[in-house]
Amino acid sequence: MNFDVAIIGGGLAGLTCGIAIQQRGKRCVIINNGQAAIDFASGSLDLLSRMPSTSNGESRTVENLKENITALRNELPAHPYSLLGAEKVLAKAQDFERLANELHLDLIGSTEKNHWRVTGLGSLRGAWLSPNSVPTVQGNELFPHKRIAVLGIEGYHDFQPQLLAANLVLNPQFEHCEVTSGFLNIPQLDELRKNAREFRSVNISQLLEHKLAFKDLVKEIIESSQGAEAVFLPACFGLENQEFMTALRDATKLALFELPTLPPSLLGMRQRIQLRHKFESLGGLMINGDSALNATFEGNKVRCINTRLLEDEEITADNFVLASGSFFSKGLISEFDKIYEPVFESDIIGVEGFNQKDRFTWTVHRFAHPQPYQSAGVAINAQCQVQKCGQFLTNLYAVGNVIGGFNALELGCGSGVAVVTALAVADEILAK
């Protein structure tokens, strides 16, 4: 099978890159092994939430994105943002904002500055873009609603309203609020309660989506809110989009918000579903349940790859994009004595002091400190071309968290790196 572009990985980075390429008339295939990290994510995207930790482990919160992305180059020269340059990073971030609006992802936020989003435990976390159904505040501004009801679902343990309510008022932006907690009694879910393993957000949303007892659910929310102006609910209402939540909001006449639960996350899954629909509607091909095994090279180019299900048939392309993610999605593999990228055997880099073949450099003794192994990934240049044996391959690019030289967990930049590098690589390929 021959394509213009073959992308390995169907997560946020792979789908974003694929959409941008398909929109310009190229023939693209995505080899997707299964669920991606986006399926377990909060639905909020971070461009850069924190600067690198100081020597004593203290992190520095980012508010002004442009200023801090520019400053990042001095502290982490191998970070993808440093390689691309602040101007290009912000331009690609704005391109993604336009794409998100086009796809009706219902995201709020901008590259001007970060905002705070409420987490499932009641703390505040910096974000670049968040679903408009998630409660957010700007800087030190007070939350606009004074009386808040946090409502869980009886028998559903992936969302704890009492804990969230107690933590929420500890934040200065919510100190003025009167926060109560309670549970919704939804008889339609009794069948799921018989098996705790099936009582998850996805199963709940699938059952409720038919709206067989919609009026009863509306009545239960109104009664349980006890006169509150705003209601915080677990993200269990509407699998593919926000239409169910919008219908509930209109029917209850309340300010309804949803919060991410323990994974799998409905908010992240919605985004992947919408991105995939867009990619396929543009004519892109998704090969699901398959994984790339190895590659054949000709000089400094990749000629083809072989996959697990199509091992007798080569996939050839003019350009290849590695969007396989980090350890979570097996884009990187860790063995006792080495960390490696399994498909192309690309060169691996990390933060200063990290050595992929020296296990003692992978961790630091303080558990809560950023761990060096989390910065491992493939080496790239300013065009996001992948390095192998010290040489950059001319038709192999890397996007997202498979790239090394930065710790996405420490910096809060994983989603930003995914979409920025994806759109930058799409531009590089289309310019050829």
Swiss-Prot record:
Where do the TM regions start and end? none
UniProt entry tagged with the keyword Oxidoreductase: yes
Query: GO BP, one example?
Result: glycerol catabolic process
**EC assignment:** 1.1.5.3
Pathway noted in the entry: Polyol metabolism; glycerol degradation via glycerol kinase pathway; glycerone phosphate from sn-glycerol 3-phosphate (anaerobic route): step 1/1
**Highest taxon in the source lineage:** Bacteria
Give the matching InterPro entries.
FAD-dep_OxRdtase_2_FAD-bd, FAD-oxidoreductase_2, FAD/NAD-bd_sf, G3P_DH_GlpB_su
Question: Which cellular component, as a GO term, is one annotated location?
Answer: glycerol-3-phosphate dehydrogenase (FAD) complex
For this protein, what reaction is catalysed?
Answer: a quinone + sn-glycerol 3-phosphate = dihydroxyacetone phosphate + a quinol
Has the keyword tRNA-binding been applied to this entry?
Answer: no
Picking any one GO molecular function of the record gives: glycerol-3-phosphate dehydrogenase (quinone) activity
Its biological function?
Conversion of glycerol 3-phosphate to dihydroxyacetone. Uses fumarate or nitrate as electron acceptor.
Q: How does it assemble?
A: Composed of a catalytic GlpA/B dimer and of membrane bound GlpC.
Name the HAMAP family for this protein: Glycerol3P_GlpB
Q: Which family does it belong to?
A: Belongs to the anaerobic G-3-P dehydrogenase subunit B family.
Q: What is this protein called?
A: Anaerobic glycerol-3-phosphate dehydrogenase subunit B
From the broadest rank down, the organism's phylogenetic lineage runs: Bacteria, Pseudomonadati, Pseudomonadota, Gammaproteobacteria, Pasteurellales
